[in-house]
Amino acid sequence: MESIVLIIAAFLTSFLSAVIGMGGGITLLGIMAIIIPTGYLVVAYHGIIQLVSNITRTTVYRQHIDIPIIKRFFIGLLPGLLLSAAMIYGATTYFNTLSAADLKIDFLKPAIGVYIIWFLYLKKKKKAISKESYKWMGVVAGIATVFIGAMGPLIAPLFINDKLKKESIIATKAACQAAGHLGKIPIFFLFFNVSYLDDWSVLLPLIIAVYIGTK
């Protein structure tokens, strides 16, 4: 029953993101956090699913990608991912654990909950932004995608306030998010021992669902 709920949720949320360019990822994240008991698996699985969804949207709207924005975002994203990896390594070293999965405190689920509350109730409308903001937001997104899972609500105001066309928002934002989700795969593989291939029976139906929903 839980698998069916996740498959339906994956399809509907990917369809939502395909239509308006945002909102689907964090909705799916919240549903997965309720059903899947372990926080790091929520983020790891969600990352793979959203990687497929975002790559599909990027491909469909590829002619509308804003390359200069992506370049600025990538400049900040890589340091953000490296900083995330360094923090996880530091935590495992400090607590003397073989894997980050062995950390006694499951901090990821509370972080997801706080993030969703912020997105729904506390987020304020941003004012006009500069082009350099994409670099700094890349750093923040590199941390958020690892420790929370969904960075869409963080970076969405940049695209909206940049007055891009709808198609450009969908394509460029999807490309940025895809890069973040791709970048965290080795982090969860190395530090949390997440074996994506061993979990194919869980992930494959969800991946197919988001692909169909996006198309």
Language-model region placement:
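Selected transmembrane alpha-helices and immediately adjacent juxtamembrane segments
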Residues: 1-36, 122-173
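Membrane-interface alpha-helices at helix entry/exit sites of multi-pass transporters
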Residues: 39-46, 67-72, 163-175
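Hydrophobic transmembrane alpha-helices of multi-pass small-molecule transport proteins
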Residues: 75, 79-84, 110-121
